[in-house]
C-alpha cells in the first residue's frame, strides 16, 4: 500500500468567500515527493487570474468590494493595488488549462494495485472550498479534474484529528495553526505563501506518522476483542 503518487498542495484566492459563485484570482501549487516528502519549491505553480467582468463597474458588488478590502488589509496595500494586480492576470480559462497541464506532469504510471495515476490533491480546507472550485472550473472549461478523485489530503481535517480533544490551539484556521506551530508566514492569505506553509504542516505530520506506523503495531490489533 506504499504511496508512489505525487502530492500536489494547492490554494485558491478568490473574490468572494462562496466557493459556488466566486471568481478565482490566484492559484498556487507545490508538489511533494511521495517517497522522500521533499517539498519541491523549484517545481511550483503560480498564477494571478483576471476575474471575468472586472473592467466593468457592475463587477464591484458590495461583497466583492469587501473581499478586495480584506485582501488589501492582509497584504498591507491599497484596494486599488489589488484591483490592478487582478486586472493584469491571465484569463481564467488560460490559467486553469495551464494548471491542468502542470498537474499532468506529476501523473504516475499504472501498475498492479495502482490504477489511479493522477496526483493526490492536498491543502487547507480543500474539501469545503478549493476542490469544489476545481470541479466547477473543470465543468465550465470542459476538462477533466487534474487530481485523484479517490484520495485527498485536507490538512484542516488532519489538524482536527490531532487537536479535537486539546485546549489548544484555539481554532482550526490556518492563521491560528501558523501561530501555534511557530510558522513565520511570508505573506498570509497570498496563494503561494499559504501553499508553502500548508505543505510544511503536512510534511511534518506525515513524517511523524511514518515514524509511528509499523505493520506489527496494527496487524491483528482487533483480534479477540
Q: Where do the protein language model's features map onto the residues?
A:
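Active-site flanking residues adjacent to catalytic metal/cofactor-binding acidic residues
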Residues: 10, 124, 153-156, 193
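Acidic, Mg2+-coordinating catalytic module of metal-dependent nucleases/exonucleases
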Residues: 118-127, 132-133, 137, 167-225
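Substrate-recognition/cap helix-loop segment adjacent to the acidic, metal-dependent catalytic center
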Residues: 129-153
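Short alpha-helix plus adjacent loop in nuclease-associated cores
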Residues: 153-168
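Conserved non-catalytic scaffold segment of RNase H-like nuclease domains
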Residues: 3-8, 13-124, 189
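Short, glycine/acidic-enriched loop or turn micro-motifs at the edges of active sites
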Residues: 14-16, 36, 157-160, 197
Amino acid at each position: 500500500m506504499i504511496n508512489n503518487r505525487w502530492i500536489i498542495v494547492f490554494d485558491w484566492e478568490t473574490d468572494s468567500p462562496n466557493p459556488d459563485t466566486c471568481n478565482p484570482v490566484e492559484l498556487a501549487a507545490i508538489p511533494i515527493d511521495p517517497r522522500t516528502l521533499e517539498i519541491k519549491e523549484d517545481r511550483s505553480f503560480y498564477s494571478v487570474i483576471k476575474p471575468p467582468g472586472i473592467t466593468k463597474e457592475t463587477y464591484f458588488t458590495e461583497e466583492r468590494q469587501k473581499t478586495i478590502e480584506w485582501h488589501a488589509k492582509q497584504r498591507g496595500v491599497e484596494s486599488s493595488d489589488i484591483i490592478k494586480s487582478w486586472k493584469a492576470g491571465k484569463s481564467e480559462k488560460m490559467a486553469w488549462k495551464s494548471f491542468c497541464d502542470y498537474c499532468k506532469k506529476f501523473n504516475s504510471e499504472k501498475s498492479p494495485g495502482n490504477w489511479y495515476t493522477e496526483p493526490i490533491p492536498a491543502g487547507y480546507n480543500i474539501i469545503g472550498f478549493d476542490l469544489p472550485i476545481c470541479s466547477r472550473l473543470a465543468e465550465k472549461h470542459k476538462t477533466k479534474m487534474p487530481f485523484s478523485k479517490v484520495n485527498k489530503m485536507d490538512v484542516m481535517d488532519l489538524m482536527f484529528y490531532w487537536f479535537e480533544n486539546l485546549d489548544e490551539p484555539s481554532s482550526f484556521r490556518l492563521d491560528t495553526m501558523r501561530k501555534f506551530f511557530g510558522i513565520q508566514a511570508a505573506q498570509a492569505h497570498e496563494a503561494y505563501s499559504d501553499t508553502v506553509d500548508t505543505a510544511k504542516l503536512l510534511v511534518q505530520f506525515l513524517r511523524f506518522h511514518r515514524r509511528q506506523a509499523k505493520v506489527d503495531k496494527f496487524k491483528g490489533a482487533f483480534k479477540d476483542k
